[in-house]
């Protein structure tokens, strides 16, 4: 005999359809919010969360188990259905269900969803009207049952609350604000005046310093011009002195070797740098004095050999 599992297949189909609906709801919400997403990533994340919730809460196994019981009853096996009926009517099962309901209520209370909110959400639902800002409030079956049991009251009383109006003296408030504004204005003006005076003093000092710098620059330029002129004059004087000595040497009756030696020493004088030229002149004068001293000693020795005497006049 062919086994019938249509109820289990239907339950499995409902679960799969619920998962697809969850994926569509998630992607459409992201599109409405303008958030770009990867469909495969959203699909994977929703599937992982959906499978975890369905398995961890036991909802999936509960639905498939009840569907299997119905299929067994349809196949003529009523033992499982009888056991489920006995289990559902057992006092321990009822106590367990009450315990689960109480846990859920306490969980909702811990999340800030109090009894009033739970009752109102259970008694009413809101139906939006397309194209309009208004909506329709619908009563649920629980609300209808409460009306039938007389558990709904209409409070027509209107409590008129007297609105307390504080009397404010706007004139005194304005005067206080005006005084504060004038005081603030005066402080700002004083600070601004002090800043202007400091700025003027800084500008005066800066202009004075600029004048001093300009005068010093002018004096430095004059001194530089004088130094350059003095250096040129010294160079010309040294060059003229060298030429004069050279001309005077050539007019003397000296041997050619002596003239050549003195000429080489004159040519070695640095006419560009006056300091070096003075050192060269010093060396030349020392050499001349040394030659004169040697000549005098030779002349003195010669006169002694000839038995002559000499005197300075």
Curated annotation (Swiss-Prot):
It is found in: Host cytoplasm. Residues 170-234 are annotated as: Interaction with host ZC3H7B. Residues 166-237 form a coiled coil. The keyword Translocase does not apply. Residues 208-313 are annotated as: Interaction with host EIF4G1. GO terms for cellular component: host cell cytoplasm. This is Non-structural protein 3. One of its GO terms (molecular function) is RNA binding. Belongs to the rotavirus NSP3 family. Homodimer. Interacts (via the coiled-coil region) with host ZC3H7B (via LD motif). Interacts with host EIF4G1. Pfam families: Rota_NSP3. Residues 150-206 are annotated as: Dimerization. Residues 1-149 are annotated as: RNA-binding. Plays an important role in stimulating the translation of viral mRNAs. These mRNAs are capped but not polyadenylated, instead terminating in a conserved sequence 'GACC' at the 3' that is recognized by NSP3, which competes with host PABPC1 for EIF4G1 binding. The interaction between NSP3 and host EIF4G1 stabilizes the EIF4E-EIF4G1 interaction, thereby facilitating the initiation of capped mRNA translation. It comes from the Viruses. CDD domains: NSP3_rotavirus. Keywords: Coiled coil, Host cytoplasm, Host-virus interaction, RNA-binding, Translation regulation. One of its GO terms (biological process) is regulation of translation.
